[in-house]
From Swiss-Prot:
GO terms for molecular function: ABC-type transporter activity; ATP binding; ATP hydrolysis activity; ATPase-coupled transmembrane transporter activity; lipid transporter activity. SMART domains: AAA. The lineage of its organism: Eukaryota, Amoebozoa, Evosea, Eumycetozoa, Dictyostelia. This is ABC transporter A family member 1. GO terms for biological process: lipid transport.
């Protein structure tokens, strides 16, 4: 069965059910329409779309220009003398020149004693001389010295606990066979090499700049030459045996400073520019979705039958496509600018990195959008995150690898808290990946970053903590995990946070069988309260009659809002509304602002879930089967659901497909409703060129498409010129024959002309129910006479004259010199005729001192409305 059909009888409408397969087709249809709409709006908004997609080009070109035409000292200071460098204290009141290990090697100690003697440095043993980590209480104020450590692992632990306190660590690996101490071979030497004459050691140099704005000295050569000098001096002074030749000195150096290539700015600040180019789409996504929420576009489409799930899926696919496109543009422009980061990296590593980051930020945007209701808030939050993230990138890019070593390899509560918090920030993992890749590609073309490097262990020299620096691949996986985390959070909070439409589910909604379609939602009923008005009581009785087969039956519909932190302050928007509406009837809702009219329509269209009660639309419950209700209903919302970038015809094509109208009937129906609202000649013009009245007429046309059985019209003629308003009124009257139309308006004249039945609501309660004549007869005063007194002094005389002339006359109200009186139509016609004759004679008398003018009319609906509101107010006092 098609999702659209012209129902010929009520039984077909009531029994109509859609199969699982048709439901799937309907979901895909909605997805296709939404994607088409997003594409069309993006193409028409070509300027903003261009900024969103092409922004990476601008940022990378700026980076390219800075890196090629910038100035500054790009190479660190290098020293080449054979003296041991002198340490400087930075964050702590102490510093050490060198740590060396192992402490159980007599030969290593002898060589370092010679180094200390040459450079006037003493040897301190850890922990006996220094105190235990992390306190090192015995070293406060110490400037210089050689610290003897048990192993290189202890040296690493030392550096992690106290960064920038020591220059380097030396780890001896082997001692030659002929080495002597006091003229004899060393006893218990664990490093003795039996088959060679080489002395091997490894130098681990601290290349962490204590000040990211300062240049970092390269002490590796100085320390190595100082140790070589100490070895040679030791052999010449302590070993005087000519048969023992000087050893072959072999050494290695870890953490050697990588000299910046020609484009130093691209290496240091590249992450900031790559981040900025990728984040523009994040801000645009926040704006575009919040715009549809703020302007009720999403709400309007949902009322017309749109699947909410497909709405969000369409935006996810749209943002996913833009994210992939932006990532490709970033990589292509980076390659075109010959930046080493891109030239030296595997393409798949780059596309995965940039795509996962932009997609993860889109997931963050969807999560934030569950709390955002306006474009102003969206732009403010988006720009705030962009600026904070830029500062974040600036600091992290400047500090490089050091910041990740501090975060992951510092054993403190602060570091632990930082690891937990930063894990949930996508830009942190993005920066980590960029830093890892940059550390390799900075040596391009000598080194390139390969796909296999994603699993490279980044913990140089091992780790002494339970935590380790994640591999690049792990950081990428964290981005993938955050996409899932924020997507699930967005899905969850979208259900429990009230949006513009006011709907929300309980926090445990996902465990309810009704959410997954395994059971129907239960309807909560409350006892029927007593109503003074007999017509209201009759309407309730008829609505509750089990034999009632009216197309629309409302039974005890109620809606209350309870404040989270003030549960006693419950606001009752609608209180027990019960009535039924027959086919071919226009029901008009009247009431002041906030009386519950729009809330009632919101419940009947499924935007709001009733607190109690239910409504049946051709037998389908708005609580348990809202999808079936939306297939046969349509809405003219209070706010136009229109996109400025689309034409009227495109809107009607969108909603006709949404309603499931067959393709062969679609064009004829579109043309029909365009003719009905007089928009045919301008149907291909963009909505941005329409006046407010034209937009309102188009909203009425959209509601009429698809031959709906029930149409909800929320103030349909607002902003329409008198001629078009008259035409719309005639249109509504002409289409009502086989339909039910629910109308709300503040225009009493409009309601009086259109409505077959009128309900006046006051503070959420149905105060009265009936047609225009019934209400006027019941609440009106029959005739209404307005008299303009000549002076304030004559007012009492005028009031006395009128009340004495007409039995049962009531003085209704006064406005300055204008007095209003009312009297019932049951008064004898001769008395009325004589009264009007007297009024005419008095006003024509030039010497009269009572009145200037007078007029007479029947009681209007305005009078009825004012009296009903006044009576209701008296009851609540």
């Amino acid at each position: 069965m098609s999702t659209y059909s012209r129902y010929n009888d009520e039984d077909e409408i009531r029994n109509n059910k859609i199969s699982f397969g048709d439901n799937i087709k309907r979901e895909f249809l909605h997805l296709k329409l939404l994607l088409k709409k997003n594409l069309l709006v993006s193409i028409r908004s070509y300027f903003s779309t261009g900024i969103e997609i092409l922004s990476p080009i601008a940022f990378i070109i700026i980076l390219f220009l800075i890196s090629h035409f910038g100035s500054g000292n790009e190479n660190p200071i290098v020293t080449y003398n054979q003296e041991l460098p002198i340490c400087k204290s930075y964050g702590e009141n102490r510093c050490f020149n060198i740590m060396f290990s192992p402490s159980n090697s007599p030969s290593a100690i002898a060589i370092m004693e010679m180094l200390g003697e040459i450079n006037n440095n003493s040897i301190y043993s850890y922990p006996s001389d220094t105190g235990y980590l992390p306190d090192l209480n015995n070293t406060i104020g110490l400037k210089g010295g050689l610290i003897m450590m048990n192993s290189i692992e202890d040296s690493f632990e030392f550096v992690l606990a106290h960064p920038n306190v020591t220059i380097a660590a030396v780890d001896f690996l082997s001692i030659p066979l002929g080495f002597q101490i006091n003229g004899a071979p060393p006893k218990n030497e664990p490093l003795l090499k039996m088959d060679g004459n080489s002395l091997e050691f490894n130098v681990v140099v601290n290349t962490t700049c204590p000040n990211i704005l300062a240049t970092c000295p390269d002490y590796s050569i100085a320390i190595t030459t100082a140790i070589e000098k100490a070895v040679i001096t030791y052999y010449s002074q302590k070993i005087r045996n000519e048969k023992i030749p000087p050893p072959t000195i072999s050494y290695g150096s870890n953490a050697f400073p990588r000299y910046p290539p020609e484009q130093g700015a691209a290496r240091v600040w590249g992450g900031l520019f790559y981040y900025c180019g990728s984040m523009i789409s994040f801000i645009f996504l926040l704006y575009k979705v919040s715009f549809e929420k703020e302007n009720k576009l999403k709400q309007g489409m949902v009322m017309m039958g749109l699947s909410v799930n497909q709405y969000w899926i369409s935006w996810f696919i749209t943002s996913f496509t833009i994210d992939i496109l932006i990532s490709l543009i970033t990589i292509i422009v980076g390659l075109a600018c010959q930046l080493p980061f891109f030239l030296g990296s595997n393409f798949f590593v780059l596309i995965i990195t940039f795509s996962l980051f932009t997609i993860s930020m889109s997931s963050v945007a969807f999560f934030l959008l569950t709390f955002i209701q306006s474009t102003k808030s969206a732009i403010g939050i988006g720009m705030g995150i962009f600026i904070v993230g830029s500062i974040f990138q600036l600091v992290f890019s400047g500090m490089g690898t050091m910041i990740f070593e501090l975060i992951y390899q510092t054993n403190s509560n602060g570091a632990l808290a930082a690891r937990i918090i930063l894990f949930f920030i996508p830009m942190f993992h993005f920066t980590k990946v960029l830093t890892d890749i940059g550390n390799v590609t900075t040596n391009y073309p000598l080194l390139t970053y390969k796909f296999s490097d994603l699993s490279t262990d980044l913990n140089i020299g091992g780790t002494v903590l339970k935590t380790v620096i994640p591999t690049t691949g792990q950081s990428i996986c964290y981005l993938l995990a955050l996409i899932g985390v924020y997507t699930v959070l967005a899905w969850y909070f979208e259900h429990i946070i009230p949006g513009n439409d006011g709907t929300s589910s309980p926090p445990w909604f996902f465990v309810l069988p009704s959410y997954w379609g395994l059971s129907l939602k239960k309807v909560r009923h409350i006892p029927t309260p007593y109503f003074d008005d007999e017509d209201v009581r009759a309407a309730i009785t008829k609505a509750h009659d089990a034999s009632n087969r009216a197309p629309l039956i409302i039974c005890g519909l109620s809606k209350s809002y309870t404040k989270l932190f003030r549960p006693k302050k419950t606001v009752h928007a609608v209180k027990y509304l019960s009535l039924s509406v027959e086919k071919g009837t226009i029901l008009g809702f009247l009431g002041s602002n906030g009386c519950g009219k729009s809330t009632t329509i919101g419940m009947l269209t499924g935007l709001l879930e009733p607190t109690a009660g239910d409504a049946l639309v051709y037998g389908h419950s708005v609580i348990s089967n809202i999808a079936a209700v939306r297939r046969i209903t349509s809405v003219v919302p209070q706010h136009d659901i229109l996109w400025a970038e689309m034409t009227a015809r495109e809107h009607l094509q969108l909603f006709s497909e949404l309603k499931g109208i067959p393709a062969q009937e679609r064009e004829s129906q579109i043309q029909k409703v365009l003719d009905q609202v007089r928009l045919s000649k301008i149907s291909n013009n963009l909505i941005s060129t329409y006046s407010g009245g034209m937009k309102r007429r188009l909203s009425v046309a959209i509601a009429c498409i698809g031959d709906p059985k029930i149409i909800f019209m929320d103030e349909p003629t607002t902003g329409v010129d008198p001629s078009s308003k008259r035409h719309l009124i005639d249109l509504v009257k002409s289409i009502k024959n086989d339909k039910v139309i629910i109308l709300t308006s503040h225009d009493m004249h409009e309601v009086e002309i259109l409505a077959d039945k009128i309900v006046i609501m006051n503070e959420g309660v149905m105060a009265c129910n009936g047609n225009s004549l019934q209400l006027k007869s019941k609440y009106g005063e029959g005739y209404s006479v307005n008299i303009v007194a000549k002076s304030p002094e004559s007012i009492p005389a005028v009031v006395e004259f009128v009340t004495l002339s007409i039995p049962g006359c009531k003085f209704m109200k006064q406005s300055a010199l204008q007095l209003n009186f009312g009297f019932p139509v049951t008064i004898d016609h001769q008395i009325i005729a004589n009264f009007f004759k007297q009024l005419e004679e008095i006003t024509n008398d030039p010497n009269n001192q009572l009145m200037r003018d007078w007029s007479v009319s029947h009681s209007t609906l305005d009078d009825v409305f004012l009296k009903v509101s006044h009576l209701a107010k008296l009851k609540t006092q």
